[in-house]
């Protein structure tokens, strides 16, 4: 099963996976009863966020409006009534807090399925634990640009607060948050890469080495990307985590 909201990407996936039996779904409720293996790779970073800014008189929502005929950030005039949570404690004026409203129902659905039927969910994304600050970003052609430039033409995302995912899966066992590079090394990626490199030459070998570095090196995806697993309680932790 694949959950994809973009019609354009669905067409691309269908072309790439035409030799396989795949069913596209609109939501997790369409997955039939039974144990699941659910992989969320760079899924949660794409979900919408709400941002809140701490000002002298309290918290205000960060909004987008028009200034000098261009998109610009601003804040709501009305102060918000904020419940005391970990997100909003130990903050000072000017701090920004990000909340993903859709995380709770999605993770609750995933954890309920795993708790009842068994299985595992592996979440791979860039982020951290107890995340605070402004992480809203835009990428176009592998370059970071102003998120308010070229609306509709760029990849918008924000870092994932893995602690929020864990809090909404309290009925399951949660693995330690592990760097992607550490996990891949524990699973033997370097040994496997060396074996594969023996049959490669020229540009193929160069690309192979670059791909290994990109996935594992601390200055690339190795540390930026984190991995967390959700399992039934009393389960044995999977290899590498």
Regions found by a protein language model. Name each.
Residues 1-9, 13, 67-79, 239-241:
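Short secondary-structure boundary segments
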Residues 37-88, 136-147:
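A mobile, often basic/glycine-rich helix-loop segment
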Residues 83-241:
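Long, Lys/Arg- and hydrophobic-enriched amphipathic alpha-helices
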Residues 1-53, 58:
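Conserved adenosyl
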